């Protein structure tokens, strides 16, 4: 309850105060809360164009008319991230049969993602959000991660409908947690 009141108070602050403040942590918190508040079920999905593991540009708009499952993951070649994406790999036929596209997104380089994709035989594209803009737009970024790393994607899952609206959103705060694969599959039906 207190968090909601605090968040509501933040949004009532005049925009000019934000423009003049030097407290970067406050600004980051404000923008994260604003993103999370605006990215609700039924809202338009933030559009993006990212470089794939095949070194090609891939845009969300390329998939208009299909459902899109976005899986954000912190880092390639780590245990839980591999489990997350291997679960999607092992169920790829289900999604493909429903005219749905799976995209994995992390802040790793496209070259790292290419090796990760090859070693795990993923049938879907892995996209590099190296500049961290898409992770931030979806409210799926850690400002502070393990070992002092900053700007790492949070584990998250989104389902985007054929008209590019968010119909499922799950952002996990604990990196070792996995998304609700059953709920994702249900939303794609």
State what each model feature region is.
Residues 5-7, 41-42:
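Generic early N-terminus positional signal peaking at residue ~5-7
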Residues 9, 15-16, 30-31:
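Short hydrophobic targeting helices and cationic amphipathic motifs
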Residues 6, 26, 33:
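Cationic, low-complexity basic patches in intrinsically disordered or flexible, solvent-exposed regions
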Residues 15, 20-27:
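Positively charged N-terminal leader segments that act as targeting/secretion signals
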Residues 10, 23-25, 48, 160:
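Compositionally biased non-globular segments, especially hydrophobic aliphatic-rich helices
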Residues 4, 10-11, 19:
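Short linear motifs centered on Gly/Pro in flexible linkers and helix caps
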């Amino acid at each position: 309850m207190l968090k909601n009141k605090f968040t509501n108070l933040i949004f009532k602050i005049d925009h000019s105060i934000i423009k003049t403040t030097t407290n970067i942590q406050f600004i980051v918190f404000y923008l994260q809360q604003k993103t999370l508040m605006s990215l609700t079920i039924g809202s338009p999905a933030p559009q993006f164009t990212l470089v794939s593991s095949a070194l090609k540009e891939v845009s969300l708009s390329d998939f208009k008319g299909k459902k899109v499952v976005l899986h954000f993951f912190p880092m390639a070649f780590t245990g839980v991230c591999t489990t997350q994406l291997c679960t999607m790999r092992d169920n790829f036929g289900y999604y493909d049969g429903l005219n749905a596209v799976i995209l994995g997104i992390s802040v790793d380089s496209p070259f790292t993602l290419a090796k990760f994709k090859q070693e795990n035989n993923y049938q879907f594209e892995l996209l590099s959000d190296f500049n961290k803009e898409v992770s931030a737009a979806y409210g799926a970024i850690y400002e502070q991660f393990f070992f002092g790393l900053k700007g790492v994607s949070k584990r998250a899952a989104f389902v985007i409908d054929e008209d590019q609206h968010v119909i499922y959103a799950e952002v996990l705060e604990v990196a070792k947690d996995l998304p609700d694969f059953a709920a994702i599959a249900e939303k794609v039906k």
